[in-house]
Amino acid sequence: LGRIAAERGLMWDVHCDETDDPMSRHVETMAREVTRYGLGVRAAGSHLTSMHSMDNYYVSKLLPLIAESGMTAIPNPLINITLQGRHDTYPKRRGLTRVKEMQAHGITVGWGQDCVMDPWYSLGTADMLDVAFMGLHVAQMTHPAEMARCFTMVTENNARIMGLEGYGLKV
C-alpha cells in the first residue's frame, strides 16, 4: 500500500498496532516503508496503542525511527480507552499511545476520532473539543502548556496531517 500511495502521490493512513500486544511491530514496519518510499508527512499511523504495552527500551529505538521517517501519528483517545485494556484486571492499561514521548521526538501528533455512533463506540459526537478534552486527561497533559498543545493537536496539527495549507488564524 505504501508503494501505491507513493506512486500515485496519495496520502497513506494505516490503523496500525491497535492492540494491547506489546510484540506487535507493524508501526516499525510502517515507518520503514514510509522511509523506503519517501512518503514522509503524507503517511499517518492511527491508534498505535501497542506502544502503551511495549517495554521502554524498544520504544526508545522505535520513536527515533518514526521521527526519521517523517510520518505522523493520530491517537484516538475515546475509542482507544474504551477498547484497549479491556481484558486487563488491575493494573489496567489506559489504552493510549505515548503521545508526550512522540511529541518530544518531534513527531506531529493529532487527536482523532474514528468511531461516531457505530458498533464500536456509540457515544461518539464528532466534536473534536470532546476528543481534546478526553485526550488531555488520559495522556495526563494537564499543565497549561500541554493543554494548549492538545487543542493545537485538533486544529493546526490535524490540518498539517491532512495536507491543508493556509489553515488557521494569525494576528
PLM regions: where:
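Residue-level marker of positions within ordered structural domains that often coincide
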Residues: S50, M71, L78, H137, ...
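Active-site clefts of carbohydrate-active enzymes
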Residues: T72, N80-I81, G85
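Histidine/acidic residue-rich metal-binding segments in metalloenzymes
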Residues: L1-A44, S50-T72, T89-W111, Y167
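Short Asp/Glu-rich motifs
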Residues: M23-R25, G85-R86, Y121-S122
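Detector for Asparagine
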Residues: N56, N76, N80, N157-N158
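Active-site-proximal loop/turn and secondary-structure-junction residues that shape catalytic pockets
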Residues: E18-D20, T49-M51, P77-I81, C115-M117
